[in-house]
């Protein structure tokens, strides 16, 4: 299930359900880039012909380089703070005959040290305007798609399929997606401070109760604060 998630509301803007034979890199051909949006994607989706189409449309993309990507450094920047985790900001050009023909323009490569995992991570992008740290932080949002898939798996019962035909599986997945969108709309309409997962849980555990939906999914404006100065009686107050 290939999904383009709009980070402004964690809402799927594009979904394409395919079989496992279709390669991820072919999926970019189905997406119409919207300038000046940023598209963060896993390196499995990197296809330089499609990425150049995004570049020509004035849309920005951020991904990670594949292990076999041939390139050479043509320039480097030094206007970054290494204490933020940034250790390199380079301008590169592709060197393999096919790649440089598909993407003839320079590409930016940022090297980031993740202190949590102690790993060095490289990012590639066609944007040369934002800071190197912003490139790394934007790519972090790619993991929001994993949260979406986790929600689909945990909150909608797809473990037991209704059927094993292609049509049955597609129908089951679309029902799960529709349920997600309905809950997201409810959350937005009532301006709930709870996450989509929390809203779904509250609705599920209260399904058989007569309760106002707004009251259920909105947090009280003035939460009750217990008086910590009240002296509680003990078993030994009389002694």
Please give the residue ranges for each predicted region.
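Single, function-defining residue in the core of a domain
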Residues: 1-239
């Amino acid at each position: 299930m290939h999904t383009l998630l709009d980070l402004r509301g964690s809402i799927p803007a594009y979904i394409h359900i395919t079989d496992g034979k279709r390669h991820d890199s072919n999926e970019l051909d189905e997406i119409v880039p919207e300038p000046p949006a940023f598209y963060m994607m896993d390196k499995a989706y990197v296809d330089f012909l499609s990425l150049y189409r995004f570049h020509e449309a004035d849309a920005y993309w951020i991904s990670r380089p594949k292990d076999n990507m041939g390139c050479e450094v043509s320039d480097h920047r030094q206007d970054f703070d290494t204490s933020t985790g940034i250790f390199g900001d380079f301008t590169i050009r592709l060197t393999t005959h096919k790649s440089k023909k598909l993407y003839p323009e320079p590409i930016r490569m940022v090297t980031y040290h993740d202190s949590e995992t102690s790993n060095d991570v490289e990012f590639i992008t066609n944007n040369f305007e934002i800071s190197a740290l912003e490139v790394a932080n934007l790519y972090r949002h790619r993991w929001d798609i994993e949260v979406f898939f986790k929600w689909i798996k945990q909150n909608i019962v797809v473990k037991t399929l209704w059927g094993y035909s292609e049509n049955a599986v597609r129908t089951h997945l679309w029902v799960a997606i529709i349920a997600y969108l309905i809950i997201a709309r409810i959350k937005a309409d009532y301006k709930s401070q709870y996450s989509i997962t929390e809203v779904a849980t509250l609705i599920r555990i209260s399904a058989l109760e007569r309760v106002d939906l707004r009251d259920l999914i909105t947090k009280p404006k003035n939460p009750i604060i217990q008086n910590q100065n009240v002296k509680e009686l003990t078993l030994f107050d009389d002694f």
